[in-house]
UniProtKB/Swiss-Prot annotation:
Gene3D superfamilies per UniProt: FAD/NAD(P)-binding domain (3.50.50.60)
Entry's cofactor comment: Binds 1 FAD per subunit.
Species of the source: Chlorobium phaeobacteroides (strain BS1)
Enzyme Commission no: 1.18.1.2
Ligand binding (FAD): T25, E44, Q52, Y57, V97, F132, D298, S339
Enzyme superclass (EC): oxidoreductase
Pfam families xref list: Pyr_redox_2
Cofactor: FAD
Gene Ontology molecular function: ferredoxin-NADP+ reductase activity; flavin adenine dinucleotide binding; NADP binding
Superkingdom, natural source: Bacteria
Catalysed reactions, semicolon-separated: 2 reduced [2Fe-2S]-[ferredoxin] + NADP(+) + H(+) = 2 oxidized [2Fe-2S]-[ferredoxin] + NADPH
SUPFAM superfamilies on file: FAD/NAD(P)-binding domain
Protein name (Swiss-Prot/TrEMBL): Ferredoxin--NADP reductase
Homology family: Belongs to the ferredoxin--NADP reductase type 2 family.
């Protein structure tokens, strides 16, 4: 398999586990398959592995993954793939799974929107939030001319914001994280949020307000963007209005609209599985109500679930570990310790 996998072609042979989704959870599940000596296949709807980390914020810095005090999203994907690729998992890109079928012998067959079929002994859904699209600002009307140019819903290249006047719209972790990351690079940062308080982590809020006190960033709470001026795809000004009626005009060369995404499970929602909070309900073994069909990461629901990368990695480990009992019924499953397994592999 080639790095960031080239799509395979033709009808594929039966493998032990098909993993639907090639984000962090899916990639780590592939590593866990290798650790447990079972074959796997990742089917990813995007042209690259990495899920949201690759598609939405490859340059964002992440701080809450164990052993990484700070890591860029794209680098985390590379590290995860570096772990998994030693076991040569099959990777199928640009294919969205449409439906599954459980066969009489207990194995599974999935079919993609293009009509390709893949067979495996068990199935793991690690498709994140499903298909996602950014939430926009409907009050601005049709701004498609600016989208992807000076109105952005994710940051693909931080260098284009170097020395620019940037307006960030939003109040969650993503909005405030980008505000803090861009402070050393942008000419000026303005953050506008329609609510009276931010929804981000406490420390991030404290850091932003501290920067505001130093005059490094302007913060507007209870405020919405009501209009913009532009020259073709070039943004010139933005106009803000607070809930008290105060209006503010500011120069802005870029506007980052970071107010979240609308998720859609797409065909997965039609599988007839129990759903809660737009996710598949699983038990303590990450199994759905269908024996042999597991879910992990953001698409898996259980009481107390946290939708963060770290939890997804744990989910993947649990799902693969317990699917062994389905793939190899009646066999005693031994606990694999990575240090021992890697030492044996190096001595081969």
């Amino acid at each position: 398999m080639k790095e960031n996998g080239d799509s395979v072609s033709g009808q594929d042979e039966l493998c032990d586990l098909t993993i639907i989704g090639g984000g962090p959870t899916g990639i780590f599940a592939a590593f866990q398959c290798g650790m447990n000596n079972i074959s796997c296949r990742i089917i990813e709807s995007m042209p690259e592995l990495g899920g949201q980390l690759t598609a939405l914020y490859p340059e964002k810095h992440i701080y809450d993954v164990a052993a990484f005090p700070e890591v860029q999203a794209s680098e985390l994907v590379e590290s995860l793939w570096g772990q998994a690729k030693r076991y040569d998992p099959e990777v199928v890109l640009d294919e969205q799974v449409r439906q599954y079928k459980k066969l009489d012998d207990g194995s599974f067959e999935v079919e993609t929107l293009s009509g390709r079929t893949f067979a495996s002994r068990a199935l793991l859904v690690a498709a994140g939030l499903g298909a996602f699209s950014p939430r926009k600002l409907p009050q601005l009307g049709d701004i498609s001319e600016l989208e992807g140019h000076t109105v952005l819903y994710s940051v693909q290249n931080m260098k284009e914001l170097e020395g620019k006047k940037v307006l960030i719209v939003g109040g969650g972790d993503s909005a405030l994280d980008w505000a803090m990351m861009l402070l050393p690079h942008a000419e000026h940062i303005t953050v506008a949020h329609r609510s009276p308080d931010f929804r981000a982590h406490g420390k991030t809020k404290d850091d932003l307000f501290a920067a505001a006190e130093k005059g490094l960033v302007d913060v507007h709470l209870n405020t919405e963007v009501i209009a913009i001026d532009h020259d073709g795809p070039a943004l010139r000004h933005a106009y803000l209005r607070s809930k008290s009626g105060k209006e503010t005009s500011l120069e802005a060369e870029y506007m980052l609209v970071l107010i979240g995404f609308k998720s859609d499970l797409g065909p997965l929602a039609e599988w007839g599985l129990e759903l809660c909070e737009n996710a598949m309900v699983v038990d303590s073994q990450m199994k759905t109500e269908v024996d042999g069909l597991y879910a992990a990461g953001d698409i898996a629901y259980y009481p107390g679930k946290l939708k963060i990368i770290q939890t997804g990695l744990s989910d993947a480990t649990m799902a693969v570990r317990h699917c062994l009992n389905y793939i190899h019924p009646g066999e005693k499953i031994k606990q694999q310790f990575s240090s021992i397994k890697m030492a044996k592999e190096k001595n081969k």
